[in-house]
Amino acid sequence: MSPPIPQTPPVNFALRRRVRNRSAAKHEQINFFCEEIAGRMFERLDYIKLEPRVILDLNCALGASSSKLAKRFPDALVIPCDPAFGLLRMHAAPKKLFSWFGKSLNRVCGEAHALPIAAKSVDLVWSNLFALSYDAPSIIRELKRVLKPGGLLMLSTLGPDTLKELRAAFSQVDSLSHIQPQVDMHDLGDMLAHEGFQTPVVDMEMVTLTYPDVKTLARDLRAAGASNLEATRRATKKKKNR
């Protein structure tokens, strides 16, 4: 009998969209980290022989990877996709953050667990810093659905040690969940294999960011749209004297 597939917490999708939309105007603040991880992903792509015709850039945010993918594969259709319309709208802002190399990219607003994309229509699903900390099995199943036979899934995500210092600090206050839990790489590999992905390769790198104070860290977390999205999290009201 196969071992049970690890489950991840249910998520408040409405809250997720609100948080990401709210972060759109400030998302450029954390581009340094997004571009660092994307650069490492593109280095790995150098070792893969692939000429995709259709590329889905999932959770594309401001579209930095979409731009680079369009340049790398000039004959491919690149589809930027994000659940936050506010971020997608930034692609067409008067002050463009990225060049689209003269190509018209079809932006799609949608959630990863229910993509508005036809089955077996995508050659490459790309996602940089994708939050797999919620509903991971159904999301991976959906990605398998949209991929063509022989298609490639390439993504980066955060690991369980993310914000471990902040989690330890909160544990001194109470026993509630303040930090969104992340998926272990071995569990992720099991989920991919369970959904029929062939020879999944999962590796890990430790990236350390140092902040001068908690206030600066909180600023970047808000800019990234990072929040505890568990549907079972405690609801709190902000008080003026808190």
Q: Where do the model's predicted regions map?
A:
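Class I SAM-dependent methyltransferase Rossmann-like catalytic core
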Residues: S2-L50
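Class I SAM-dependent methyltransferase SAM/SAH-binding core
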Residues: L50-A118, L124, S138-R141
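Conserved catalytic/acceptor-binding region of the Class I
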Residues: M154-T216, A223-K237
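Residues lining the SAM
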Residues: D123, S127-A131, S156
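A short glycine-rich, Lys/Arg-flanked "PGG" loop and its adjoining helix->strand segment in the class I
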Residues: P137-L152
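Surface-exposed interaction regions that form or flank ligand-binding interfaces
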Residues: L88, A92, T232-R242
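A short His-aromatic
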Residues: L129-Y134, V146
